[in-house]
Each structure stands twice: as C-alpha cells, then as structure tokens.
Amino acid sequence: MSHRDTGTHYENQARHYLERAGLVFKAANVTYQNGEIDLIMRDGDTWVFVEVRFRRNALFGGAAASVTYSKQQRLLRAATIWLAQRNACFATTPCRFDVFAITGSELEWLPNAFNAD
C-alpha cells in the first residue's frame, strides 16, 4: 500500500469512528499552500478540524506525539483560511482542533488537543 493509500485508509477509519461518535462529516483533505486539514467535522455548532496520524509503533512516542508545534501551526493556518473563505473566524465561530492518533492497532481520539490561541 502506498503512503497516500495508507493515509486515506486511516483517515477513513477516523472519519467512521467520529461519525459513530455523533460528529457529522463535512470535508476531507482540504489543502492550502500553508497546510492541510485531514478532516473537517461538525459537532453540534462547533467546527472540528481533525489531524489524523498513524504510526506503526510507539518507538518514537507514537502517533499523538508526532503532532508537533509546527504541525499545529500549519493546521491553524489552514483552518484560518478555510474559515475566512466562509466569512468566519476563530473569534466568532466555535471551533476545536482534535487529533485522531492510531499507533499500531490502538485508536486514540483527543478532542480539543490544542487551541487557536
């Protein structure tokens, strides 16, 4: 399986898990020059921007640990653009940033993993 196919597989797995948890799927793989948003979901009135990470094992800290500060900043920039295209911003629109981490066969959903602050 190619790297891209692997990413799509785990993004679909995350999407279905989150849908079963009650979130509503809105978009996937939204890409801008500054970054990419793996999944955009809706949880009631809140927009949820989801970073999906997969690691085969926890040797270097696992999937959740791979969401570095610079990765968070790229996701924040992409979400800022996405919101602006809809005449919205973090100050006026309920949003959160979740991480869906898959390490080996272990799934970990981290709601509100980091902030736009």
Swiss-Prot record:
Q: Which GO terms describe its molecular function?
A: nucleic acid binding
User: What domain of life does the UniProt record list for this protein's source?
Assistant: Bacteria
The record's annotation in CDD domains points to: PoNe_Nuclease
To which protein family does this belong?
Belongs to the UPF0102 family.
HAMAP family, sorted: UPF0102 (MF_00048)
State what protein this is by name. Answer: UPF0102 protein YE3728
Q: What organism does the record attribute this protein to?
A: Yersinia enterocolitica serotype O:8 / biotype 1B (strain NCTC 13174 / 8081)
